[in-house]
Amino acid sequence: MVASPIHSRGLDLPLPSTMGEFGLSLPRSPLFGTDGIRGKAGELLTAPLALSLGFWAGQVLREQTDTAGPVIIGQDSRLSSDMLANAMAAGLNSAGVEVWQLGLCPTPCVAYLTRKTAAIGGIMISASHNPPEDNGIKFFDHQGLKLPKSLATAIEAGLRGQNQTSGLNASQWGRSYGQPHRVQYYQDFLLGSLPQPLNFQGLKVVLDLAWGASVNLAPHIFRSLGAEVIALHDLADGSQINVDCGSTHLHRLQRAVRETGADLGFAFDGDADRVMAVDAQGRPVDGDYILFLWGKTLQESNHLPDNLIVGTVMANLAFERAWEKLGGKLIRTAVGDQNVQAQMWETGAMLGGEQSGHIICHHHSYSGDGLQAALHLATLVQKSGLSLSELLSESFQPYPQILRNVRVLDRERRLHWQECAPLQQAIATAEKSMGTTGRILVRASGTEPLIRVMVEAACAETAAHWSDQLTSTVQCHLGDS
């Protein structure tokens, strides 16, 4: 190996002459999925991979912006997040890029600060709602938007080629700086996005923080506005992040709201880019409801151009029909907040989101923000003088919708499920039977080794019947034994 020496405390340490000498073992399939790179920490996501990714991300982002700004890195509480964040920073430094490390913070904080500063990009170390053993690397461009596919492809091409060096000497390497104080600017932004004057006094709120990125900010902001806050899972404990709690496991939040007599509750995922709510009776309030209520408020104040909302193929049919009755229009796109964002830019929509709780409001930001959505929903409750239950009674009754997951580890089978003839036949039979009274959606998850089967129907028994049939077919012909 041709190496350059690093002199440190009298030692000559070998420095690889190219990033290809770190011994990476990359999968044949593309690294980048629907939301950056995600996988098991220590298996797919290793320190050498993060180091090399940092180097190539630095090259691509600097070339794209043609400036010498920093890259901002934030992270959630996972045990592997420190390792990956520091390795990414080292790789970026080796490409001559300065790094600002925020430490623990929500994903939308990284997106906001990237857009509002001279940063050339942002990186969040998080696997969102995934279990503790997973981790992920999310990238943002200089506008605070999820990285365009072209830039992700360029980074991966460099990573797989591994045939270049930075051409920099030690005096040109970047430096890393701890910048946790900058999270305060994001907090100021959130408070500034709310109507003034505002006081949450008299409002009792339960917050499920999922042991994740929102443990510091969310309780502090709600309390600063005068709310009485009961916080669940409120330590940055990466060994428990998302375990039986957070936005995908609402039962603890529901119980706490009922037992404490709270007005409402909010559950965030591990990186707080999504939120789910519950009313005083503990009934779930998903992204469809949040979009409807926030959209109605914007519509009434003439701040919703063309009464347009962007949702996804998962949006409940009852939500769409209720919104149409108010003179609105729902445009559906593929699942994923990046797809919602793209459709919002294309159509000029100011509000969009997903049933899973990613909510984007272009009046304030360009990324899904669970904390912002929670604050605006709480504001609506406080200013209306109505309970969340009363507001929901004026919205819609969702059609029964059953979502089931089938584990399919084989990536090729998972991505090419459409080629399974028995499954296609089963889908056709179900669609013919339900006609216009229901919908079916089968898709491969972009973040987990799962095929998701969603069946929606006006009748709960019908939805359950076809959900059983289709899930069994997927398991039989594609699933793991």
From Swiss-Prot:
Domain of life per record: Bacteria
Keyword Phosphoprotein: yes
GO annotation terms (biological process): carbohydrate metabolic process; peptidoglycan biosynthetic process; UDP-N-acetylglucosamine biosynthetic process
Cofactor annotation remark: Binds 1 Mg(2+) ion per subunit.
Reaction catalysed by this enzyme: alpha-D-glucosamine 1-phosphate = D-glucosamine 6-phosphate
Gene Ontology molecular function, alphabetical: magnesium ion binding; phosphoglucosamine mutase activity; phosphomannomutase activity
Active site: S128
Keywords of the record: Isomerase, Magnesium, Metal-binding, Phosphoprotein
EC numbers, comma separated: 5.4.2.10
Post-translational modifications: Activated by phosphorylation.
The keyword Manganese appears for this protein: no
Binding-site residues for Mg(2+), renumbered to this chain: S128, D269, D271, D273
GO cellular component, as recorded: cytosol
Pfam assignment, any one: PGM_PMM_II
Stored HAMAP family: GlmM_B
Function comment: Catalyzes the conversion of glucosamine-6-phosphate to glucosamine-1-phosphate.
Family: Belongs to the phosphohexose mutase family.
Name of the protein this chain belongs to: Phosphoglucosamine mutase
Organism of derivation: Synechocystis sp. (strain ATCC 27184 / PCC 6803 / Kazusa)
Gene coding for it: glmM
